[in-house]
C-alpha cells in the first residue's frame, strides 16, 4: 500500500508541476487568443475545435486507454501493442482528416470555417500520437517524461501564439501555432520513450489490428459520446445562433477547460494503479475510488461557489467584449464538480473491465444532451447550452453510481458524511462572500482561509487521510 501511494503521488508531483505550467500557459494564451480574435473569429475557432473533436473516435478509437490497461498488466507484450497501434493510426488518420473536411464542406459552412476545421483535424492527428505514446509512460508509471512533454508543448504553444499576434497572421496563424507546437513536442516524446522505456517501431499485423479495434471500441464509443455532449453545444450554437454567441460561450468554456486539466493529471496517474488493484487487491481499489471522490470534491466544490459569485469579474480578463459570458460561466462552473466525480466513477468502471457500462451511460447522456440543446439553445442561446451541459452531468452521476453499486464498489456512509462536510464548508463560504461583498482579489485569500478553517474544524481530514499524507511524504 505504501509503495503504491508513494509511486502514485510521486508521479502526480511531476504531473502537478507540469500542470501548473500548463495551466498558466493555457490561461495566458486563451486570453491572448480571445482578445486578438474578438468574439466572432473566436467563435469560428471554437466551432472548428468542437466540430473536429466530434470525429475523434476515428483517430483515437479508444487505443490509449486500452493500451494503458493492457501494458500495465502485460509488459512482455508491450511491443506488440504499441508498434501495431502506431501503424494502425496512420490509416485512421487519413480517414479522420477526410471525414472532417468533407463533412464541413457538405454543411455549407463558409470557407474560413472549413479551413479551420481541416487545420484543427491535422493538429488532432498529432495529438492522438501524443496520447498513444503517453500510454506507455502511464503503464510504466514514469510520468516524469509525460510531464516534460506537456511542459514543452504548452510553453511552445504560448510562445507561438504570442508570435502570431505580433505578426498579425490572423485565425489561420493561430491554428498553425498549435500544429507546430504539437509536432515539436512529439519529437521530444519519441526521443524520451526510446531512451527510457521502449524503442517503438512500425508493425503491420492486420490480424492484430482487429484485436485492437475490437478491444478499443467500447473506450472509443465512450469517448465519442463524452465528446458529443461536451462539443456539440458549440456546433449547435453556431448553427442556431451566431459565431458571436459561440465566441461568448467558448470564452467561458475555455476557463472551465483550464480547471479540468487537473482531472486529466489525476486520471492519468490513478487509472493504471486502479487497473493493477483490480487484478490484485480489490479492497484497495475501492479505497482509491472513495479517496478520489473525496479529494476531487474537496477542491472543486469551493471553486464553483467562488465562481458563482465572481463569474462576471473573472470573465472580464478577456475584455469588455466578453462581459455577457459571465452569466454562462456561473452556470458552467458546476459541471466541474460533477465531471470530477463522474470521472472517478468512469475510472473504476474502466479499470474493472466494465467499459461497456460507461459507454452506455455516455450514450444516454449524449442523446439527452442533444435533445435538451434542440429545445434550449433556440430559446435561450448560450444559457440554454450551459444548463443542458450541467443537467447531463447530473444524469451521468446517477447512472454511474448505479453501475458502481452493481460491482460492489459503492462508497459507504463515511464518504457521504465527508461530502456533507465539504458542502457545509462551501456553503458557509458562500454566505461569507455574499455578506462581505468583497473585491474579487481580496475575496480569494479570504475564501481560502475561511474554507480550510471550516474543513479543519469539522474534521474532514480523518486519520486515514493523515496516514496517506505521511506515506506520500515518506514517513
Which role fits each region the language model picked out?
Residues 1-4, 8, 144, 171-175, ...:
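Interhelical loop/hinge segments that connect adjacent transmembrane helices in multipass membrane
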Residues 25-29, 46-71, 124-130, 223-232, ...:
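Small-residue-rich midsections of specific transmembrane alpha-helices
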Residues 27-41, 165, 224-259, 272, ...:
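Helix-terminus/linker motif at the lipid-water interface of multi-pass membrane proteins
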Residues 71-88, 248-363:
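Specific pore-lining/lateral-gate transmembrane helices of multi-pass inner-membrane transport
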Residues 114, 118, 148-195, 211, ...:
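Hydrophobic alpha-helical transmembrane segments
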Amino acid at each position: 500500500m505504501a509503495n503504491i501511494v508513494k509511486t502514485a503521488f510521486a508521479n502526480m508531483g511531476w504531473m502537478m508541476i507540469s500542470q501548473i505550467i500548463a495551466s498558466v500557459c493555457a490561461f495566458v494564451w486563451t486570453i491572448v487568443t480571445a482578445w486578438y480574435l474578438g468574439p466572432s473569429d473566436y467563435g469560428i475557432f471554437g466551432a472548428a475545435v468542437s466540430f473536429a473533436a466530434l470525429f475523434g473516435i476515428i483517430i483515437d478509437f479508444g487505443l490509449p486507454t486500452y493500451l494503458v490497461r493492457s501494458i500495465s498488466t502485460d509488459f512482455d507484450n508491450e511491443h506488440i501493442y504499441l508498434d501495431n497501434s502506431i501503424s494502425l493510426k496512420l490509416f485512421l488518420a487519413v480517414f479522420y482528416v477526410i471525414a472532417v473536411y468533407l463533412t464541413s464542406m457538405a454543411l455549407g459552412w463558409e470557407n474560413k470555417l472549413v479551413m479551420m476545421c481541416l487545420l484543427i483535424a491535422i493538429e488532432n492527428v498529432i495529438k492522438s500520437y501524443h496520447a498513444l505514446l503517453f500510454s506507455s509512460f502511464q503503464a510504466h508509471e514514469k510520468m516524469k517524461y509525460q510531464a516534460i512533454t506537456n511542459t514543452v508543448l504548452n510553453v511552445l504553444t504560448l510562445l507561438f501564439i504570442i508570435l502570431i499576434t505580433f505578426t498579425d497572421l490572423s485565425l489561420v496563424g493561430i491554428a498553425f501555432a498549435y500544429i507546430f507546437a504539437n509536432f515539436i513536442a512529439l519529437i521530444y516524446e519519441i526521443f524520451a520513450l526510446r531512451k527510457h522505456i521502449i524503442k517503438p517501431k512500425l508493425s503491420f499485423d492486420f490480424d492484430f489490428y482487429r484485436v485492437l479495434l475490437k478491444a478499443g471500441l467500447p473506450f472509443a464509443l465512450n469517448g465519442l459520446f463524452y465528446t458529443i455532449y461536451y462539443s456539440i453545444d458549440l456546433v449547435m450554437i453556431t448553427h442556431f445562433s451566431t459565431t458571436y454567441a459561440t465566441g461568448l460561450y467558448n470564452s467561458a468554456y475555455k476557463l472551465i477547460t483550464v480547471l479540468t486539466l487537473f482531472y486529466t493529471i489525476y486520471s492519468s496517474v490513478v487509472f493504471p494503479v486502479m487497473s493493477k488493484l483490480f487484478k490484485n487487491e480489490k479492497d484497495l481499489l475501492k479505497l482509491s475510488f472513495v479517496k478520489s471522490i473525496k479529494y476531487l470534491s474537496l477542491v472543486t466544490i469551493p471553486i464553483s461557489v467562488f465562481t458563482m459569485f465572481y463569474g462576471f469579474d473573472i470573465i472580464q480578463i478577456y475584455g469588455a467584449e466578453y462581459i455577457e459570458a459571465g452569466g454562462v460561466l456561473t452556470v458552467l462552473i458546476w459541471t466541474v464538480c460533477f465531471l470530477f466525480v463522474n470521472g472517478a466513477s468512469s475510472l473504476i468502471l474502466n479499470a474493472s473491465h466494465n467499459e461497456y457500462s460507461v459507454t452506455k451511460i455516455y450514450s444516454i447522456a449524449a442523446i439527452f444532451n442533444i435533445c435538451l440543446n434542440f429545445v434550449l439553445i433556440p430559446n435561450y442561446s448560450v444559457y440554454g447550452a450551459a444548463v443542458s451541459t450541467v443537467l447531463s452531468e447530473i444524469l451521468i452521476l446517477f447512472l454511474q453510481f448505479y453501475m458502481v453499486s452493481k460491482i460492489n464498489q459503492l462508497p459507504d456512509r463515511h464518504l457521504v458524511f465527508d461530502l456533507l462536510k465539504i458542502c457545509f464548508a462551501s456553503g458557509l463560504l458562500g454566505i461569507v462572500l455574499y455578506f462581505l461583498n468583497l473585491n474579487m482579489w481580496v475575496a480569494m485569500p479570504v475564501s481560502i482561509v475561511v474554507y480550510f478553517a471550516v474543513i479543519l474544524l469539522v474534521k474532514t481530514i480523518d486519520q486515514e487521510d493523515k496516514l496517506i499524507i505521511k506515506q506520500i511524504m515518506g514517513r
